[in-house]
């Protein structure tokens, strides 16, 4: 709605009878439009202040969100302007400025020294001016230098390993590389602690991983009769990564999701390397599936245990429990800019232990992402590797299909998108890897395998498209998915024992 008002001004002395003395315009202030009748032949500077005063009185009860931040008390000189255009000259009249009845104007506050001139001469220059891409400055140079350190370290490590191999595999090489890795780790700590450079500290930490893992791998002696690097060296490198991750705890920026991912993956690699080293390589795929299932199905429990989120004490009737007993208080908690004012007010109104609960909740979310992602990766790798030719070919294909279905079902149970993405990626990666593996084994049936693969992919896309308008899973459907998921997991374990020959071993036991 608009509030019409008339701002009277002195009449021009030489106005002719053919030209109207007033002009009806619409003034836009925020989202409110107000119709005004203004003098047409008088310079605008003679009545602009009166017009602003009238509008201020008319719109004084208008909500602030309707005005859109418009402030009648702004400093400067008021002027009229067409929307998106420079202000009109105050020494001109509305007729001189080409303002006619029905024109839309806005009020702007300008300085008396403001001058408006075109910034560009053509469209190409305008595009160049509007391009707000960041320039290459000192910060960009620092980022480049930080990222270049681990990238250049990788080929240097490769050359050092080649020299170590060609010069008799002396222990001085891994010792020197390990000392260099420790020095870089100290540099990462110094960069984060004293120079507050998180990017450089993270780049140095990545470099430390490369150096320490290489040193640990080269320090493991080759077995007798072996002339190449193998499972013992992989186990040594994975062990170094595991202990380094436990020591750094997510690095300078507390990336706990990456730390938890590295820990679980390193444990799986160590176990697989040990199995290969002692001749139990046939058990590695089944063991990977079992370990991956354990991590994926128990990720929430592991998260609560590692994050140390304790349940509040349950008092007996009549017993009072202090709020501070829920969690240990955190000294001098500092609010971050990411928190809303409402959340900050809530935190300020409760004991300091609530801040610790918030920190633990964030840590739990990061740990859950890492656990589910690593468990899914191990599960997918085991599902592809477990398929073997021979008597258990069909059995192993059934196990891989069940694992694919389990990953697809569980992707709908997680609200965290990274967890869902990891499970969906496994749902796609397992059939793709199996198809590639079968084509390598049976190249004459490649056309049939590819046709089946593309048909299944097309059906999956149709199913996903048909569920585009399903915003959430109902409790009944969710419970059904959980039951199907549990039944499939229960079917996977016996089939794994069957494939690995455990049943045959038990059957052949003689007392």
From Swiss-Prot:
Its main location: membrane. Disruption phenotype: Double espI-eccD1 mutants abolish EsxA and EsxB secretion, but not their expression. Disruption abolishes EsxA and EsxB secretion, but not their expression. Results in a lack of antigen specific immunogenicity and leads to attenuated virulence. Mutants exhibit defects in bacterial growth during the acute phase of C57BL/6 mouse infection, but survive for 140 days despite a wild-type bacterial load in the lungs at 100 days post-infection, suggesting the pathway is required for virulence. It comes from the Bacteria. The modification N-acetylserine is found at residue 2. Residues 2-143, 192-202, 249-257, 307-367, 410-420, 466-482 are cytoplasmic. It is found in: Cell inner membrane. The chain crosses the membrane at residues 144-164, 171-191, 203-223, 228-248, 258-278, 286-306, 368-388, 389-409, 421-441, 445-465, 483-503. Keywords: Acetylation, Cell inner membrane, Cell membrane, Membrane, Transmembrane, Transmembrane helix, Transport. Residues 165-170, 224-227, 279-285, 442-444, 504-511 are periplasmic. GO terms for cellular component: peptidoglycan-based cell wall; plasma membrane. One of its GO terms (biological process) is biological process involved in interaction with host. It is a multi-pass membrane protein. InterPro entries: T7SS_EccD (IPR006707), YukD-like (IPR024962). Belongs to the EccD/Snm4 family. Possibly a homodimer. Part of the ESX-1 / type VII secretion system (T7SS), which is composed of cytosolic and membrane components. The ESX-1 membrane complex is composed of EccB1, EccCa1, EccCb1, EccD1 and EccE1. Part of the ESX-1 specialized secretion system, which delivers several virulence factors to host cells during infection, including the key virulence factors EsxA (ESAT-6) and EsxB (CFP-10). The structure in 4KV3 was determined for a fusion protein with E.coli maltose-binding protein. This is ESX-1 secretion system protein EccD1. It comes from Mycobacterium tuberculosis (strain ATCC 25618 / H37Rv).
């Amino acid at each position: 709605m608009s509030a019409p008002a008339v701002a009277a001004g002195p009449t021009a002395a030489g106005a002719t009878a053919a030209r109207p003395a007033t002009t009806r315009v619409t003034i836009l202030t925020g989202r409110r439009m107000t119709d005004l009748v203004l003098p047409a032949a008088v310079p605008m500077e003679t009545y602009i202040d009166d017009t602003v005063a009238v509008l201020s009185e008319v719109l004084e009860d208008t909500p602030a969100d309707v005005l859109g931040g418009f402030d009648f008390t702004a400093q400067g000189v008021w002027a009229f302007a067409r929307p998106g255009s420079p202000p009109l000259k105050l020494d001109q009249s509305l007729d001189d400025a080409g303002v006619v009845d029905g024109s839309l104007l806005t009020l702007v506050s300008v300085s008396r020294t403001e001058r408006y001139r075109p910034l560009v001469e053509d469209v190409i220059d305008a595009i160049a001016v509007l391009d707000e891409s960041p320039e290459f400055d000192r910060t960009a140079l620092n980022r480049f230098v930080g990222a270049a350190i681990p990238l250049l370290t990788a080929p240097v490590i490769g050359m050092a390993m080649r020299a170590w191999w060609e010069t008799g595999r002396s222990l001085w090489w891994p010792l020197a590389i390990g000392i260099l890795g420790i020095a870089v780790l100290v540099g990462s700590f110094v960069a984060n602690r004293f120079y507050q450079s998180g990017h450089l500290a993270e780049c140095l930490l990545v470099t430390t991983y490369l150096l320490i893992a290489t040193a640990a791998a080269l320090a493991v002696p080759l077995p007798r009769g072996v002339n190449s690097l193998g499972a013992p060296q992989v186990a040594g490198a994975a062990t170094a990564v595991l202990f380094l991750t436990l020591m750094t705890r997510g690095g300078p920026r507390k990336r706990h999701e990456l730390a938890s991912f590295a820990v679980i993956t390193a444990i799986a690699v160590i176990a697989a390397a040990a199995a290969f080293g002692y001749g139990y390589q046939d058990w590695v795929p089944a063991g990977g599936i079992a370990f991956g299932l354990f991590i994926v199905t128990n990720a929430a429990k592991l998260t609560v245990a590692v994050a140390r989120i304790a349940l509040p004490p349950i008092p007996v009737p009549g017993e009072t429990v202090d709020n501070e007993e829920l969690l240990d208080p955190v000294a001098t908690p500092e609010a971050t800019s990411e928190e809303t004012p409402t959340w900050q007010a809530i935190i300020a109104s409760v004991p300091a232990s609530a801040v610790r609960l918030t920190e633990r909740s964030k840590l739990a979310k990061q740990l859950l992402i890492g656990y589910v992602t690593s468990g899914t990766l191990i599960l997918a790798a085991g599902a592809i590797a477990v398929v073997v030719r021979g008597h258990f070919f069909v059995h192993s294909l059934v196990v891989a299909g069940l694992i694919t279905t389990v990953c697809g079902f569980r992707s709908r149970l997680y609200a965290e998108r990274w967890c869902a993405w990891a499970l969906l990626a496994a749902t796609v990666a397992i059939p793709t890897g199996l198809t590639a593996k079968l084509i390598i084994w049976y190249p004459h049936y490649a056309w049939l395998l590819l046709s089946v693969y593309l048909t299944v992919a097309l059906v999956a896309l149709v199913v996903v498209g048909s569920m585009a308008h399903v915003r959430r899973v109902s409790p009944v459907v969710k419970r059904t998915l959980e039951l199907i998921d549990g039944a499939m997991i229960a079917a996977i374990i016996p089939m794994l024992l069957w494939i690995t020959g455990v049943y045959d071993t038990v059957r052949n036991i003689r007392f």
